[in-house]
Amino acid sequence: MTHHLAPLDSLPTSIYPPSAYPPPSFFESSSLIYPALLIPAKRTGEVQKTLKDVIFTEPKRKSVYPLEEGVDYSSIEVSAEGGYDPMKERKVVLIRLGDIAGKNEEEQITGIKEDPVFQDARVKSMLLSAKINIGAEPSTAPNAATNVEEVPSSFEIAGHVAHVNLRSESLPYKYLIGKAILDKNPKLRVVVNKIGNIENEFRTFPMEILAGEGLDLDLLKEHGCRFKLDFAKVYWNSRLQGEHARLVQYITKPKECIVADAMAGVGPFAVPLTSALAPHYYKTTVVCHANDLNPISYKYLQTNAQLNRCFADRLITYNLDGREFIHKMNYERIEADHFIMNLPQMAPEFLDAFRGWKFDDTTGHRPIIHVHCFDEKTRNEEETARMETHVLQRCEAALGSSGCLVDKRQENDVQIRVVRDVGPRKNMLCVSFRLPVEVAGVEKLLLTKNSDAEVNGKRKRENYDCVAEVSNVSKKERDS
């Protein structure tokens, strides 16, 4: 039996750009018009292999369908010899949608026939339109955008909120990606995308909602503690839970200690340090002075203290500027064993608040400072040494004493640790050291009430502006 078809190895192929992939409406149950080839059933595998770049491929979806009953295929010009029955022996192979959205059936077919893969007259004659009913199946939704470059393979989860950082290549598919994430993760209720950098001292970032709704987290669990927070108005990063646990474990080794958390947020360090539910509670007596400038974070810090049985004599909360808080600790002679400064964007600059520090003449007590910051990634020992020198010099500049860390690393117990990978060229670091005695001889930084009020007012306005930047695209618009 001979079929008048061109040799498949002579057919050109075509790879469609991301814009050729199914739009969000693909997931709505409806009859869609797809271009298709009418082929002999016995050559199905051969066709699929040769035209793999243009054949419709979607996990758990068929690319080959039987011919529909009641449809007249007599217009197809490919002849069958020897009594070959095209109604039984041929199948429809769906081809990916091209740039034909919004056009009628005739325009679609005309446009598709202009593709190089169909220029062979005998192939063009096999082309027909097929109405296939493809309904929504949540289980296959995440695969809709798998061919878009840079679709995130992972994302941060905070309670029922998924946080993604989409690249520009993926933005045309952002609502589709958001829906896919929700479909595959029933416990999630909302997906947000970061649309700007963290540029204020509250560490909040402008975001848009891609799918779902509800940024108020009723309950978020981390290392045995429960937290409430509003993801849009306070800072929370679930990827730092390892760092939270590490510092808590390190600080609670002695039988008793005092901690000053200058940028405490909603309490990821302060709460587990002082919670009566923590395993170390009856072994180590920890008193934590926890501060945050953001009034909303301060409110949730107090709420989380109650949730986790952090008693008032163990966890003392403040709503002050970071520098003012550090001055207060020294002025009131609170001999903290550790200062935590988790504000990576600018924490090293806050070290100027330690200038003119009054050490205890009797004990000579020097607190350990834990400063989080960002710096470049390194590829070898030479680059690492250069990076560490740069980070320490940045701290020295704020302390007002050159060489007090770089030249006295062993004396001041200097340690630099990579906390996590932030980006292709950036790491988050934790720099720990004992407060150098040299800072006592540096002129103290003066904080006037007027300047503090002005600075605090500016920061609060920045925070509210940032919160207002949460995109208000309606759920209806996202789903359309």
From Swiss-Prot:
Its EC number is 2.1.1.228. It catalyses: guanosine(37) in tRNA + S-adenosyl-L-methionine = N(1)-methylguanosine(37) in tRNA + S-adenosyl-L-homocysteine + H(+). GO terms for biological process: tRNA N1-guanine methylation. PROSITE patterns: SAM_MT_TRM5_TYW2. GO terms for cellular component: cytoplasm; mitochondrial matrix; nucleus. InterPro entries: MeTrfase_TRM5/TYW2, SAM-dependent_MTases_sf, TRM5-TYW2-like_MTfase, TRM5/TYW2-like_N, tRNA_Gua_MeTrfase_euk. S-adenosyl-L-methionine binds at H244, D292, L293, D321, G322, N342. GO terms for molecular function: tRNA (guanine(37)-N1)-methyltransferase activity; tRNA methyltransferase activity. Keywords: Cytoplasm, Methyltransferase, Mitochondrion, Nucleus, S-adenosyl-L-methionine, Transferase, tRNA processing. SUPFAM superfamilies: S-adenosyl-L-methionine-dependent methyltransferases. Its main location: mitochondrion. It is an enzyme of class 2 (transferase). Disulfide bonds: none annotated. Gene3D superfamilies: Met-10+ protein-like domains, Vaccinia Virus protein VP39. It is found in: Mitochondrion matrix; Nucleus; Cytoplasm. Belongs to the class I-like SAM-binding methyltransferase superfamily. TRM5/TYW2 family. Specifically methylates the N1 position of guanosine-37 in various cytoplasmic and mitochondrial tRNAs. Methylation is not dependent on the nature of the nucleoside 5' of the target nucleoside. This is the first step in the biosynthesis of wybutosine (yW), a modified base adjacent to the anticodon of tRNAs and required for accurate decoding. Monomer. This is tRNA (guanine(37)-N(1))-methyltransferase. It comes from Thalassiosira pseudonana.
